[in-house]
Amino acid sequence: MVQRLTYRKRHSYATKSNQHRVVKTPGGKLIYQSTKKRASGPKCPVTGKRIQGIPHLRPTEYKRSRLSRNRRTVNRAYGGVLSGSAVRERIIRAFLVEEQKIVKKVLKIQKAKEKLAAKS
């Protein structure tokens, strides 16, 4: 006859957060062993892609004591938060905005010079 099993924790419903595995102990008994949820890993909020170079862990395992800083981040601006393509887009956009401001300023100065030349 098969041995009956009971949950070892108080949470008694078969939910996603209460998944278990049947394991045979060295004494020959069957027990429930709780399994951890699979980690999906960090995603870029802009592109939705996975961030390269960071391990897929549960959120609590990214804490200081469990994972060193160089494993938690990537060595660039917004490292470990945004994907490389999103960072590249941001840098290019910022550069183009600055260039546009400079062009606007130069055009304004040229227009002012033309007005002065027309008056005199």
Swiss-Prot record:
PROSITE patterns hit by this protein: RIBOSOMAL_L34E
Keywords: Ribonucleoprotein, Ribosomal protein
Stretch forming the signal peptide: none
InterPro entries in the cross-refs: Ribosomal_eL34, Ribosomal_eL34_C_sf, Ribosomal_eL34_CS
Pfam families named in the record: Ribosomal_L34e
Gene3D superfamilies noted in UniProt: 6.20.340.10, 6.20.370.70
GO process terms (BP): ribosome biogenesis; translation
Keyword match Chaperone: no
Gene Ontology, cellular component aspect: cytosolic large ribosomal subunit
Entries under PANTHER family matching the protein: 60S RIBOSOMAL PROTEIN L34
Family: Belongs to the eukaryotic ribosomal protein eL34 family.
The protein's name in its UniProt record: Large ribosomal subunit protein eL34
